Regions:
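Peripheral, non-transmembrane regulatory/ligand-interaction domains of membrane transport proteins
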Residues: 1-164
């Protein structure tokens, strides 16, 4: 799924791509892949790196392109593993900003809503990258709080069972 977002008192979605917009691609399909590689000329190697579930956070440059890979938290559907991290790639050059994640997460939609609620204007690609890193940190803390609550509950239950 591909969205074109423009920063005007928060991100607003538009119908088509224009220079200096943010293209957010979530769970890309063949049409998205074709758009990114053929129309925007995004290096295929970047998209392949982002698809690797074990990819580590890093930056890489190729020609005029910059790839920034982050690991963002998301809820897991695996039993006994409440949360996992997945890679998201932010690919930029002079007039193009693209984020690609091969998983549906709550982070990006929440980030977009936050910019709208607070009327945040993102002026450049580095500002966007830093704000996404900050948003990721907020989600890590949110999930850590849930884990701490689960641990506290388990400790109370264990203490109670030991007394009986």
């Amino acid at each position: 799924m591909r969205k074109y977002l423009y920063s005007e008192n928060g991100f607003t979605e538009k119908a088509e791509w224009q220079p200096n917009c943010w293209v957010n691609v979530e769970c890309p399909d063949n049409d998205d892949f074709k758009f990114l590689t053929e129309e925007l000329k995004v290096p295929e190697s970047f998209l392949e790196d982002i698809a690797d579930v074990d990819e580590r956070p890093r930056t890489e440059t190729e020609d005029n392109w910059l790839l920034t890979i982050l690991r963002i938290p998301m809820q897991s559907n695996q039993r006994g593993v409440p949360f996992i991290t997945v890679p998201i790639g932010i690919i930029t050059n002079d007039g193009i900003i693209v984020s690609v994640c091969y998983h549906h997460t709550e982070l990006i939609p929440d980030f977009i809503q936050h910019t709208r609620r607070k009327n945040i204007v993102v002026n450049n690609k580095l500002d966007l990258i830093l704000r996404i890193i900050y948003s990721s940190a907020v989600w890590f803390l949110k999930y850590l709080k849930q884990i701490n609550n689960d641990v506290a509950t388990a400790e109370k239950e264990l203490e109670k069972s030991i007394r009986n």
